[in-house]
Regions:
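Conserved class I S-adenosyl-L-methionine
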Residues: 54-67, 80-85
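Class I SAM-dependent methyltransferase Rossmann-like catalytic core
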Residues: 2-56, 69
Length: 261
């Protein structure tokens, strides 16, 4: 696999296999030798970001992929949720989830997030509430001026996003441009809650290797500051065995909460 070319954004519709992605990365959030506590870190940071109740309103989850884990905690504090995703096959998975037809289960992720909340909600009740709050599943492309074409979204109160921009950008300049484009969708005073990778160049789904543009912590923070976001919290973790590069060569991961000036 080492000699295979890296696939990029335009390859997703033809080559990204959501079923394999879900079974590889979203079967269980428990720490693994390869990813460490990446998934539990993500769930914990999203829960902590929304726990204060200060981040609320209308939410867009940008680059949702075939998963709903980014909005588990957000769903309790946001009145409506739009799921925006580039790949048609991933949007199809999200529609299957919303209708209750998806065979893959996110129950272990929901259970972990609900235990963090400590309110005693059941997995079934939370998932039902999430489905009801999803007001749409729409296409998006961060490379376009209107990133939600053919839809038009004026502004929202909250944007969440996980592992998205690094899979699109091919340079720091591109990442900065895309960060500014995404930030422009937020109303003044709106919040961004972001989870992503630090360093690296790829991740794998089945037999395919997809580009993941690696940036340092300081480069990432500078890009969002340049986009007009005031960083409120920044937290990061590291992969336990960075020498293992079968599925990914990223160095670590981060969570950012920021507010638009």
């Amino acid at each position: 696999m080492a000699g295979k070319p890296l696939l990029v954004s335009d390859d997703y519709p033809s080559s990204f296999e959501p079923d394999i992605y879900l079974s590889t990365y979203y079967s269980d959030p428990s720490p693994t030798p390869l990813l460490g506590d990446m998934m539990t870190f993500s769930l914990t940071q999203f829960q902590q970001a929304f726990a204060s109740g200060q981040i609320k309103g209308r939410l867009i989850d940008f680059g949702t992929g075939p998963t709903i884990t980014s909005v588990i905690s957000a769903s309790e504090h946001c009145e409506s949720i739009l799921l925006a995703e580039f790949s048609p096959q991933n949007r199809n998975i999200l529609k299957q989830w919303q209708s209750g037809e998806l065979k893959h289960s996110f129950a272990k992720f929901l259970d972990y997030a609900l235990k963090l909340d400590g309110k005693g909600d059941s997995v079934a009740d939370r998932e039902s509430s999430m489905r009801e709050k999803v007001s749409g599943i729409i296409p998006c492309d961060i490379r376009k001026e209107n990133i939600f074409a053919p839809c038009f979204i004026s502004s929202v109160d909250v944007i969440t996003s996980s592992l998205c921009l690094e899979s699109v950008a091919r340079s720091i300049a591109e990442y900065e441009s895309q960060a500014a484009r995404l930030a422009s969708v937020l109303r003044p005073g709106g919040h961004l809650v972001l989870f992503g990778c630090i360093g690296g160049s790829f991740y794998t789904v089945g037999s395919h290797r997809f580009s993941s543009f690696g940036m340092t912590s300081s480069e990432l923070q500078a890009a969002w500051t340049k986009a007009g976001m005031k960083i409120i919290t920044w937290k990061e973790g590291r992969r336990p065995n960075p020498e293992q590069k079968e599925e990914s060569d990223t160095d670590g991961f981060f969570a950012l909460v920021a507010k638009k000036a």
